[in-house]
């Protein structure tokens, strides 16, 4: 059921992009829905994910919440990096 829902959402987004691209609108207005649709589709394919908050141990930047990086603040080659700004 979840895959069907995602498929319907993807089809809707693609149809919306096609309709907007065929209309005689401004180029800037055409580009924005495509950017939004790409980001939304990417988020749907990845599924729900929780980010790692600040000062919590991490392994790579992708798992940290936005505006945070997985790094050590004291030693460059530490064993336990944390999500930090």
Swiss-Prot record:
* Expression across tissues: Expressed by the venom duct.
Q: Name one GO molecular function term.
A: ion channel inhibitor activity
Propeptide per record: which residue ranges?
24-49
UniProt entry tagged with the keyword Nucleotidyltransferase: no
| Signal peptide limits | 1-23
Keyword annotations for this protein? Disulfide bond, Pyrrolidone carboxylic acid, Secreted, Signal, Toxin
Post-translation changes: Contains 4 disulfide bonds.
Question: Where is the protein situated, by its record's location annotation?
Answer: Secreted
Q: Could you give the domain comment from the record?
A: The cysteine framework is XV (C-C-CC-C-C-C-C).
Which family, according to UniProt? Belongs to the conotoxin O2 superfamily.
Q: What is this protein called?
A: Conotoxin Lv15a
């Amino acid at each position: 059921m979840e895959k069907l829902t995602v498929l319907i959402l993807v089809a809707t987004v693609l149809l919306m992009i096609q309709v907007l691209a065929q209309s005689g609108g401004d180029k800037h207005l055409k580009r924005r829905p495509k950017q939004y649709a790409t980001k939304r589709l990417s988020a749907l394919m990845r599924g729900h994910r929780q980010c790692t908050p600040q000062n919590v141990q991490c392994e790579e930047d992708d798992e940290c919440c936005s505006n945070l990086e997985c790094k050590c603040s004291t030693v460059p080659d530490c064993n336990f990096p944390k999500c930090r700004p």
